[in-house]
Amino acid sequence: MEDDSLYLRGEWQFNHFSKLTSSRPDAAFAEIQRTSLPEKSPLSCETRVDLCDDLAPVARQLAPREKLPLSSRRPAAVGAGLQNMGNTCYVNASLQCLTYTPPLANYMLSREHSQTCHRHKGCMLCTMQAHITRALHNPGHVIQPSQALAAGFHRGKQEDAHEFLMFTVDAMKKACLPGHKQVDHHSKDTTLIHQIFGGYWRSQIKCLHCHGISDTFDPYLDIALDIQAAQSVQQALEQLVKPEELNGENAYHCGVCLQRAPASKTLTLHTSAKVLILVLKRFSDVTGNKIAKNVQYPECLDMQPYMSQQNTGPLVYVLYAVLVHAGWSCHNGHYFSYVKAQEGQWYKMDDAEVTASSITSVLSQQAYVLFYIQKSEWERHSESVSRGREPRALGSED
């Protein structure tokens, strides 16, 4: 394991680890040890997103934010239905959710990537750009998704929609890296995809003997929620950030006092994603059987209670897509999705069938994956649509 010594604001030492995973909060990205918490000024919802810039120096900014348009370039009408090519409902449901992700769709329709990409063939960003453009510009039609979208994944049978979704997101992230494969891990997290879907966990361990504190940061692209004991998404999030006691055989080896001592471990979201992907863990890892229970989820979700920084005001997200599984096992059943189109109308996207729906129907589903976008970003998007304004940069000021 290779360690690099870096500094946060000139005072906190990092120990960097070479292996990263995007969705597991227990995989370390960077660790800080100190004897007490420093004073920090309150942060706004807008500035909190940029905290990841302080985790480590960025050697190279792979996707400048001024090149990520947030305002809409999309047609007003809902787009095309997708043809099922044989057990590909999981592909179609996932693609529809990504197609109606505002910052991703706006970037794809800007053709920013294809104008500079030298790969084209085998590039997931180019493939997704072609798909999203076709889907959104062919309302009332049914189109056939390119086989390249599921190349290397689809094996002619029913697959897990969430696994395909993250396979696609990861492939798009890798497509941002040609020519930059030797950059450091933190710079890789400045890609277009991480700017849209990414954030950072903070795992904080406090030694109860010397009160020393160790912070570990890890990037994420989605958040998995255990729903076994939860009746709502909020309850599942509360369980996720609930402090854990480390004692007895599980006592903590403190790097400050160098003793094995009882400690408290707390996981929180250090930086918030522009677009939040919440996956409800409905399937058993062993049997694949489904947890077929109703888990309530809101149209508007305040993520502030689960953030590292408290007392900074609400951090509200709005629901814009829901991926649903109908059936009793991950090995069979049917996937479809609900998406919120540009004008605010909800639609059920069930392979080739596209039908208008209501928020009441959307909120009554046994959801598998939920897609939320920061309310401030959605409002900027909606405002630009109503005023017919030109696309603005992600994170730019009015």
Swiss-Prot record:
SUPFAM superfamilies: Cysteine proteinases
InterPro entries: Papain-like_cys_pep_sf, Peptidase_C19, Peptidase_C19_UCH, USP_CS, USP_dom
CDD domains according to UniProt: Peptidase_C19E (cd02661)
GO MF annotation: an example: cysteine-type deubiquitinase activity
Subcellular location: Nucleus; Cytoplasm
The keyword Hydrolase is assigned to this record: yes
A Pfam family recorded for this sequence: UCH
EC number: 3.4.19.12
Main location: nucleus
Catalytic activity entry: Thiol-dependent hydrolysis of ester, thioester, amide, peptide and isopeptide bonds formed by the C-terminal Gly of ubiquitin (a 76-residue protein attached to proteins as an intracellular targeting signal)
Gene Ontology BP annotations: protein deubiquitination involved in ubiquitin-dependent protein catabolic process; regulation of apoptotic process; regulation of protein stability
PROSITE patterns membership: USP_1, USP_2, USP_3
Active site: 89, 334
Keywords assigned: Cytoplasm, Hydrolase, Nucleus, Protease, Thiol protease, Ubl conjugation pathway
Described purpose of this protein according to its UniProt entry: Deubiquitinating enzyme that removes conjugated ubiquitin from specific proteins to regulate different cellular processes that may include cell proliferation, progression through the cell cycle, cell migration, and the cellular response to viral infection. Seems to be non-functional in the regulation of apoptosis.
PANTHER family linked: INACTIVE UBIQUITIN CARBOXYL-TERMINAL HYDROLASE 17-LIKE PROTEIN 4-RELATED, UBIQUITIN CARBOXYL-TERMINAL HYDROLASE
Protein name, entry field: Ubiquitin carboxyl-terminal hydrolase 17-like protein 6
Organism, scientific name: Homo sapiens (Human)
Encoding gene (name): USP17L6P
